[in-house]
Design a protein with these regions (language model features):
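Structural motif corresponding to alpha-helix initiation and N-cap regions
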Residues: 33-36, 64-67, 92-96, 127, ...
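Active-site mouth loops of central-metabolism enzymes
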Residues: 23-31, 55-60, 85-91, 117-125, ...
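An N-terminally biased module of ancient metal coordination in phosphate/nucleic-acid-related enzymes
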Residues: 1-71
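Catalytic pocket-lining loop regions of alpha/beta-barrel enzymes
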Residues: 123-216
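Acidic (Asp/Glu)-rich catalytic clusters
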Residues: 39-47, 68-80, 97-109, 126-139, ...
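Active-site beta-loop-alpha junctions enriched in small/polar residues
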Residues: 10, 56-57, 86-91, 113-117, ...
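Structural preference for beta-strand elements that scaffold enzyme active sites
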Residues: 3-6, 49-52, 81-85, 108-112, ...
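Short aromatic-enriched loop/helix-cap "lid" or pocket-rim segments at secondary-structure transitions
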Residues: 14-20, 66, 96-98, 123-124, ...
């Protein structure tokens, strides 16, 4: 079997940090620890050679604890975790100081902020402070994971254009709705997470023209 690199590994230990979104409706089954031993058991027959941890939107006060949690896992030789993308908010005051503390931690590969949430308005990632924060990631040789509403992929294009020295990972193929892409469900302009097939295709094509953008 071909060795697999799992580039989007979610783990959490609720005794070490809090995930506010676990209180949302519909995620009751996730309200428990998901630890490395659980992952190893589940993936035992998948030939996973390496993994990259993906941040889990912890409470802001727990971001450092999350980074410490995954750094320790990366240091150990009893699991395949080789690197981590941690939580952070490039547009916030203090982001530069926060992320700078990891510049000599070779396990920390980059940052993600979940952007498809109600309190993040369209166009947010084009704010000057956000752009500067993402540009600084490039200076540190770190990447930024893009995880936003599919109808706002044009904003991602605008951000990428302003950050030529930063590499980007576009998560979940831009969060497209496969039912819309397949033509089974129409675009609903009143739904903030809806999109049209043509808009998604056009924006994905534009993002694909940038060498510093990788899609997964």
């Amino acid at each position: 079997m071909l060795p697999i690199v799992d580039t989007h590994q979610h783990l959490w230990d609720l005794s070490q940090f809090t995930l506010p979104w676990l209180e949302s409706d519909g995620v009751e089954m996730l309200r428990k620890d998901h630890l490395m031993r659980d992952y190893l058991e589940t993936s035992a027959n998948a030939n996973v050679a390496r993994t990259v941890y993906m941040e889990v939107d912890v409470a802001p006060a727990d971001r450092l604890a999350e980074a410490q949690f995954v750094t320790e896992l990366c240091r150990r030789d009893d699991n395949p975790m080789a690197g981590a993308v941690i939580g952070g908010r490039p547009g916030e005051v203090g982001f530069r100081e926060y992320i700078s503390q990891f510049k000599n931690n070779h396990f920390i590969k980059g940052v993600r902020q979940v952007l498809h949430v109600p309190d993040t308005a369209p166009g947010y990632i084009l704010n000057a402070d956000f752009v500067k924060g993402v540009q600084y990631l490039g200076e540190l040789d770190m990447i930024f994971d893009l995880c936003l509403r599919p109808g706002e992929l044009a904003d991602a294009v605008g951000l990428v254009n302003q950050c030529p020295e930063t590499y980007f990972i576009l998560d979940h193929c831009g969060n497209a709705d496969p039912n819309i892409i397949n033509g089974d469900v129409p675009h609903d302009p009143e739904n903030p997470v809806s999109h049209s097939k043509e808009q998604w295709q056009d924006d994905m094509s534009t993002l694909g023209e940038h060498e510093q953008v990788i899609c997964k």
